[in-house]
Design a protein with these regions (language model features):
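Domain-scale signature associated with acetyltransferase and cell-envelope carbohydrate enzymes
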Residues: 1-178, 183-184, 205-236, 243-265
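Flexible internal linker/loop segments at domain or repeat junctions
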Residues: 188-209
Length: 265
């Protein structure tokens, strides 16, 4: 029997046929588990659960026009979506643990993968709304509390740890990064990596410099702000438009803005 025939037979065995009536493809590999709660609708979506991963989806969720992929890696084997969740147009790749509580909204506004979890965990509370991107690598952890809102084109990127408490408002195009994202190699080393991994540019084989980012509760972060590695915001902090914070601690109730200087010519 050819490998192609074996793959087709395996797909037919792993396919959950009842979701075809909702124009969806749901594939659960042997050894993996998927539990779906009552009154949950999976519409025009694709869900894949592989590598002995266990996924639980709560009651009364709506998953529409999504591609959700769950794989086990580096010891992470469990993911869960709480009840009354709403996923609209979301592209999720989870090679780790993705867990969110009840009443969370995920709305993707671009074709770029919204949620990418490599060898790490994303743990979310309840009653949040996300329209941003996540990228988690190197077994990093992201913890987000309750009643937070993060708008379009914002980006949380973790190679170590990002924590955010409750009732925060994050505007558009905000960068929250705990990492340098890349290492600086010698020109000869970078050329070697470029040639070896072409057409994948900027390949990394080791974790760059990182330091945790902590955001308290009731903070407001304005458009185009950057909260970079080692930054800590206590409760009720306001970060102004285009403000850049790196490795600093902002005390309770403070408003921080960039220095503005005018030049008259």
């Amino acid at each position: 029997m050819s490998k192609k025939v074996v793959r087709i037979l395996r797909l037919l065995i792993e396919l959950r046929y009842k979701y075809l009536f909702q124009f969806s493809i749901v594939i659960v590999e042997r050894g993996s588990k998927l539990e779906v709660g009552e009154n949950t609708k999976i519409i025009k979506s694709k869900i894949v659960v592989k590598n002995r991963h266990n996924l639980q989806i709560g009651n009364s969720c709506i998953i529409k026009k999504c591609t959700l992929s769950f794989y086990s890696d580096n010891g992470w084997r469990e993911s869960s979506i709480g009840s009354n969740g709403n996923f609209n147009g979301v592209y999720l790749q989870a090679y780790g643990s993705f867990k969110c509580g009840d009443w969370n909204i995920f709305e993707q506004k671009s074709n770029t993968p919204m949620l990418t979890v490599f060898n790490g965990s994303l743990d979310i509370g309840h009653h949040n709304r996300f329209m941003n991107r996540f990228r988690i690598r190197y077994n990093a952890n992201v913890r987000i509390g309750n009643y937070n809102n993060i708008n379009e084109r914002s980006w949380l990127r973790a190679d170590e740890q990002i924590t955010m408490k409750d009732y925060n408002q994050i505007s558009y195009n905000v960068m929250i990064w705990d990492t340098n994202t890349h290492n600086i190699y010698t020109p000869s080393k970078r050329r070697e990596l470029t040639e070896k991994y072409y057409p994948f540019f900027g390949y990394e084989y080791e974790k760059p410099s990182t330091k945790p980012v902590k955001i308290g509760s009731d903070c407001w972060i304005a458009q185009n702000a950057a909260i970079l590695k080692g930054t800590e915001l206590e409760d009720e902090v306001i970060v102004g438009f285009c403000t850049i914070l790196l490795g600093t601690s902002i005390p309770f109730g403070t408003t921080v803005v960039n220095k503005v200087e005018y030049r008259f010519v």
